[in-house]
Amino acid sequence: LRDPQPALAVLAQRIELSEDAELPETAVDDELLVIFANAGLQTGHAWRQRLEAWMAAGEDERQPTLEAPSFGERVLWRPGRALVIGNPERCRELLEGLAVFAWHEGHLRRLEGETAAAWEPAQADVELTQLPRRAALRRQEHVNRQVRRTTLWRMAYARLESHLEKPPLQLNGAVRRLYNELAMQAEVHDRLATLDDRIEVLQDLYELAADRLGEYRYFRGELRVEWLIVAILLLEAGLSLWELWNH
């Protein structure tokens, strides 16, 4: 994986589960827990229900479980975990597709969270886009950080967008269709459009604020120089009058 940053997908652990085995807990960041179960009569009804309950545990409206058929396999996915019921021979290729989709969707979700968290503080910074006052100069460092941060968001978005709008070429045809189905159900296209608008607004806000603060700082510097010139001229005029008075 190269975008939005270079990474390797590593199979950290592989365990054969029995029907009475304890199922894995919630995944940590950038980790995907995947359970493969045989299709048909090889997987009992009670075991299948338990696996489906494991998938549903902890889900909410923002992270519902998605279900996508893939040539006879039943694939369920949500952030951090997935369940595949089907042919064990397709385990490797399906695992690759799920890992790639989870990586890109996870970065999309992370960008959504970071920009959403920046929205309310940004409302307090709107005043910096108007004619600033002297006290506003103390927020220059904050504005500079936000300009850098929004630029990094834009760069990450640009690298991420193409991989979510279109499946990576290294996936085979069947897995690419699974990737597309998951992306459609996760409403990736609409989420990308919303994220794009949000980043654009934040970028415009802080770039304009940086310009306003820069202009105000320059104005104050020019004003100091002009007052210094006036003071020098007044001093020269005073000296001239003093010399004239003495003569």
Please annotate each region the language model reported.
Residues 136-236, 242-244:
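Membrane-associated alpha-helical segments
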Residues 2-143:
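Extended alpha-helical interaction modules
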